[in-house]
Structure formats: C-alpha cells, structure tokens
Amino acid sequence: MNDDNSLKGITHRFRGYLPVVIDVETAGFNPATDALLEIAAVMLDVDAQGNWVIDETVTRHVHPFEGANLDQAALEFTGIIPDHPFRKQIAVSEKIALQDIFRVIRHQLRKHQCKRAILVGHNAAFDLGFVNAAVERTGIKRNPFHPFSTFDTVTLCGLAFGQTVLSKAVDAAGLGWDPAHAHSAYYDAEKTAELFCMVVNRWRSRHS
C-alpha cells in the first residue's frame, strides 16, 4: 500500500471516520438475550491506484455469555453448533473477542489518522446492536465505533445493483457467491467488504 495514497484516501473520504466492515452470527435476533457466536471485522485500505481494498480480516468464535438464549431455528439457519468440540477449543469469551478486534481497529485509527470507526454491515443495525450489547455486557469502556451511525450495504447495493439480499447483490456485482461458506462471519464480512469497496470505488472520481 502507498502510505500517502492511503492517508489521503481514507482520512478525508468520510470526514475522519474509518469504515470497518463487521459481520456477526448469532443465536437469535435480540442482542440483549441471544448469544453472539461469531464476529468478523474487515479492515480496509487504499492501494497505489487509489482503489479501496481489503487490508486484513480478524475473526473470532465466541462462547455464549452466561444465560444466553440459543434459538434452535437460528442455529439451524447458520449451521453453527455451539458445543461442537472443535469450536469449544477455539472460541473465546465476548470480552476477549471484542478486545482483540478493537485493538486492531485502534491501530487502524492511528495508522489512518481517523477519529472514530464507523460500522459497515449488511443490515448494519443488526450487527451494531449486537456489538453494542456485548460491549455493555462486558463492561468495555472504549468502544471505537460510532454509537448509532453506520454504512448499510443493503441500501448501497439496492442503489448500485438493484439487489438487497447479500448473496444476490454479490452475484449481481460479479463477485461470485459460494453458498457452502454462507453464514460464516468471516465469509459474509469479506463479501460485504468487497461490495462496499466496489461501490466506493465507482464514486471515487466524484470525491478525488
């Protein structure tokens, strides 16, 4: 990455806000009661040609918090088995998962001289709701994300590609969707990031 291009492209593109793509996989729809099971965060950068690209992805499997609800329909939808032996070996607590991801985000904020992160997600309010609920549960004091503002790729993809469902938007954009990897936080976050970068790059000339 060209550091000068990166700073110019990221620091000022969104008024000092750093877009970070987040996807969560959960055991339900209620962030106050339902378990957070996976979280992935995709960091973005600007290449030597001035295009927005994926920089790095951080992902964690998460142990359900004590007393968390595990909705069977949600588990069947995602295919996640919370008590699978392999998953139990690699999963971490909500607090550790968030601390690990927030540490990387803070490094990116310093690197790009941005004042705060802004969450990018497909149905972003859902992801931000679970992140904020986990932050409150774990007592983490420094949440790098704006508390309510987001970039939602549902809206962006509806405008750019005429599709609002993630898989259909990815196909419409010509990025290729693999159903076998769907509902993995890592895969969904990276595909969301690819869509976001494509939309931003299409509008680059208007903001250069």
Question: Predicted segment positions?
Answer:
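Conserved non-catalytic scaffold segment of RNase H-like nuclease domains
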Residues: N2-H122
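Short, glycine/acidic-enriched loop or turn micro-motifs at the edges of active sites
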Residues: T26-G28, T155, K191
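Short, polar/flexible loop-turn hinges at active-site or ligand-entry regions and domain interfaces
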Residues: P82-I90, T138-P144, W177-P179
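Acidic, Mg2+-coordinating catalytic module of metal-dependent nucleases/exonucleases
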Residues: I118-A125, G129-F130, A134-V135, S167-S208
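Conserved protein kinase catalytic core
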Residues: F29-P31, G158, E194
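Acidic active-site catalytic centers that drive phospho-/nucleotidyl reactions
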Residues: D23-E25, D127, D152, D188
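Active-site-proximal helix-loop-helix substrate-binding element of RNase H-like nuclease domains
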Residues: V62-T78, P82-P85, T153-A189
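Histidine/lysine/aspartate-rich catalytic loop segments that bind and position anionic ligands
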Residues: V135-I140, P144-L159
